[in-house]
């Protein structure tokens, strides 16, 4: 059996990280891979498309019900879904109460101690990436996830989050084996999105693994709590996810130590691509509008 690959999908909230990861993992099953998903997002939506159900019970919720994590059995928290994919959600506290990253730490320790990582080819962590705090960075910090894939788009905040995540990876890369596997761009149909994604990947000393085109069939599948791979296996979008899965599968050992950029460099890049207008351009447009308004009858 090949060595266990521990990968993680990071990305800002709402970027489509969980949807992308579940579709990719469903496609990896078709390549004969055995997979465990560890959801590390407080929304606990990392496995619903694989399980074809509402969010599963989380480790923290079930531990609270039973008394403590020590009172749990592996079967209490681990469910099996599409293609035999094993699913666990770490969960988190109520909003405004405690550290959401605590669930990540508790879950990973529990799963390792109870043999959940045995007999799988991939462990995939689905992690919130708006902030890379100690808890959410746990898969990186503890040298669990060794290949990080950042899901992003051509939108400003998605680019900012991707750069921030790269900074978090860099912090732990020198002391461990964690590497940036690459960027995955979820198309939002912004200006020059593909060019921008490739440019950011290059600046981060990485590569754009795949550009996932926008397609409404993804939403149709999600409404039915299914991946596109399951819902419409012969669709063009399913083929895109299979292509992405193949790229990740062949990317073992090809990760890099990222070179994050400053906020000023990120803004300069947006200016270079004509995405963000300079102060001079904004003033010119404002003056033109004022002149137009003054001469209007």
UniProtKB/Swiss-Prot annotation:
Keywords annotated in UniProt: 4Fe-4S, ADP-ribosylation, ATP-binding, Iron, Iron-sulfur, Metal-binding, Nitrogen fixation, Nucleotide-binding, Oxidoreductase
Binding-site positions, ATP: 11-18
E.C. number(s) listed in UniProt: 1.18.6.1
Modified residues (ADP-ribosylarginine): 102
UniProt PTM: The reversible ADP-ribosylation of Arg-102 inactivates the nitrogenase reductase and regulates nitrogenase activity.
Subunit details: Homodimer.
Oxidoreductase in keyword set: yes
Name of this protein: Nitrogenase iron protein
CDD domains cross-referenced by the UniProt entry: NifH (cd02040)
Cofactor binding: number and manner: Binds 1 [4Fe-4S] cluster per dimer.
Residues where [4Fe-4S] cluster binds: 99, 133
Intrachain S-S bonds: none
Gene Ontology BP annotations: nitrogen fixation
Cofactor: [4Fe-4S] cluster
Lineage: superkingdom: Bacteria
Cross-referenced NCBIfam families: nifH (TIGR01287)
Reactions catalysed according to its record: N2 + 8 reduced [2Fe-2S]-[ferredoxin] + 16 ATP + 16 H2O = H2 + 8 oxidized [2Fe-2S]-[ferredoxin] + 2 NH4(+) + 16 ADP + 16 phosphate + 6 H(+)
The species this protein was found in: Rhizobium leguminosarum bv. trifolii
Pfam families, A to Z: Fer4_NifH
GO molecular function: 4 iron, 4 sulfur cluster binding; ATP binding; metal ion binding; nitrogenase activity
InterPro entries linked: NifH/chlL_CS, NifH/frxC, Nitrogenase_Fe_NifH, P-loop_NTPase
């Amino acid at each position: 059996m090949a060595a266990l690959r521990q990968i993680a999908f990071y990305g800002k909230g709402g970027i489509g990280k969980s949807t992308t990861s579940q579709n990719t993992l469903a496609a990896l099953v078709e390549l004969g891979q055995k997979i465990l998903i560890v959801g590390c997002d407080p929304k606990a939506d990392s496995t619903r498309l694989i399980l074809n159900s509402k969010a599963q019970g989380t480790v923290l919720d079930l531990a609270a019900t039973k008394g403590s994590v020590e009172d749990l059995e592996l079967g209490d928290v681990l469910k099996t879904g599409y293609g035999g994919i094993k699913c666990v959600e770490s969960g988190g506290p109520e909003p405004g109460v405690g550290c959401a990253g605590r669930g990540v730490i508790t879950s990973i320790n529990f799963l390792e101690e109870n043999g959940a990582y045995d007999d799988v080819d991939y462990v995939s962590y689905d992690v919130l990436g708006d902030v890379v705090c100690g808890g959410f960075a746990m898969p990186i910090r503890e040298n669990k996830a060794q290949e990080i894939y950042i899901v992003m788009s051509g939108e400003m905040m998605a680019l900012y989050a991707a750069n921030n995540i790269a900074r978090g990876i860099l912090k732990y890369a020198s002391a461990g084996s964690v590497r940036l596997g690459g960027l995955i761009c979820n198309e939002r149909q912004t200006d020059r999105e593909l060019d921008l994604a490739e440019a950011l990947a290059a600046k981060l000393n990485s590569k754009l693994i795949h550009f996932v085109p926008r397609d409404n069939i993804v939403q149709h599948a999600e409404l039915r709590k299914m991946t596109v791979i399951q819902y419409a296996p012969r669709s063009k979008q399913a083929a895109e996810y299979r292509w992405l899965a193949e790229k990740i599968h062949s990317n073992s050992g090809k990760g890099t130590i990222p070179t994050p950029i400053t906020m000023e460099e990120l803004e300069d890049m947006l200016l270079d691509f004509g995405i963000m207008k300079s102060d001079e351009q904004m003033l010119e447009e404002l003056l033109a509008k004022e002149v137009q308004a003054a001469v209007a009858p």
